[in-house]
Regions:
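Short loop/turn motifs that connect adjacent beta-strands in outer-membrane beta-barrel proteins
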Residues: 24-31, 99-105, 139, 167-178, ...
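Outer-membrane beta-barrel transmembrane domain signature
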Residues: 149-266, 270, 277-279
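Residues on the lipid-exposed face of transmembrane beta-strands in outer-membrane beta-barrel proteins
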Residues: 37-39, 59-65, 92-96, 129-137, ...
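Transmembrane beta-barrel strands of outer-membrane/channel proteins
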Residues: 35-41, 63, 73-75, 107-111, ...
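Flexible, solvent-exposed coil segments and beta strand-coil junctions
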Residues: 38-41, 70-75, 108-112, 136-143, ...
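Solvent-exposed loop/turn segments connecting transmembrane beta-strands
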Residues: 46-55, 77-88, 113-125, 148-157, ...
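Short glycine/proline- and aromatic-enriched beta-strand/turn motifs that initiate or cap beta-hairpins
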Residues: 24-78
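Bacterial Sec-dependent N-terminal signal peptides
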Residues: 1-26, 269-271, 275-279
Length: 279
């Protein structure tokens, strides 16, 4: 759910304002239930895509047990020339988020339940856990995070970013938050490398030959750069979010004559649209 986590700082800023208002006359906190509908114009995983230019719809249910602890679940429906609103699986998350005036800290554990027939680029992912830290100030917010991804192998990832939050109050007692941001993503990549090695066990009458060797390789590389600008409008219990983004995948894995083992990706614009209601 990378798209969801990108605007955590801006959404957390709004949560801080709403929480302060809601608790101004009471010290008790009640669980909050939230429902949202999200639409992604181009599903991707660090800029990696399928060959069908798929878009996705994922309704999300969130239960905030306290202002800091939450659980959520989001079924994912995929649209492309071959599929129309096809169910691909569900992603569930449990997490902790502490929003302060200077620091935002977050810890989460995500468990996907993808269909075996899912064509999503990230469908091999079995679980993911991560932490993030944001330092807020008036000039620029500094974001850093790390994660561990579990599939048939274990991969490690890091995120670094900068953003600047602009808050505008509207005449109808709403608020608009604009959060231009830039991010860099890095992580381990696992792939096979094939090369030829001289065979030194030849005899006098038989020439030495080359032996083909295939080995597993793991490298830590930059995965993508991204510029994004979440625009959030909130009034009362309603929140509307539009997040245009431009992502540039890096270090795509390519295997000669094996498109099934190669990564597909390109620099591209995409957007995530969200409508959320808090009960």
């Amino acid at each position: 759910m990378k798209q969801y986590k990108k605007f955590v700082a801006a959404a957390a800023f709004l949560m801080l304002l709403q929480s302060a208002h809601a608790q101004s006359d009471s010290t008790k906190t009640k669980p909050q239930f939230k429902l949202s509908v999200n639409y992604n114009t181009r599903l991707n995983y660090y800029g990696r895509t399928d060959s069908l230019r798929s878009s996705g719809v994922f309704p999300m249910a969130e239960l905030w047990l306290t202002p800091k602890f939450y659980v959520n679940a989001a079924p994912i429906f995929v649209n492309n020339p071959l599929q129309s609103f096809d169910y691909a699986g569900t992603v569930a998350t449990v997490g902790y988020q502490n929003v302060g005036t200077k620091w935002i800290t977050s810890v989460y554990l995500t468990k996907p339940f993808y269909k075996e027939s899912s064509e999503l680029v990230q469908s091999a992912l079995q679980a993911q856990s991560g932490v993030s830290l944001t330092y807020q100030n008036k000039i620029v917010n500094i974001n850093a995070g790390g994660d561990v991804k579990f599939s048939d192998k274990v991969d490690y990832g890091t995120t670094a970013g900068l953003d600047h939050i602009v808050r505008i109050e509207t005449k109808n007692k709403g608020v608009v938050v604009i959060d231009p941001s830039v991010y860099a993503y890095a992580g381990t990549q696992n792939f096979q490398r094939t090369y030829y090695k001289k065979n030194n066990s030849g005899f006098l009458l038989f020439p030495r030959n080359n032996q083909q060797v295939t080995e597993e390789v793991s490298r830590f590389n930059v995965l993508a750069y991204e510029a994004t600008m979440p625009i959030i409008y909130a009034k009362g219990k309603v929140m509307l979010i539009a997040t245009p983004s431009y992502i540039m995948p890096q270090n795509l894995i390519t295997v000669p004559n094996r498109p099934d083992l190669s990564e597909r990706g390109e620099n591209m614009f995409y957007a995530t649209l969200t409508a959320k209601y808090t009960f």
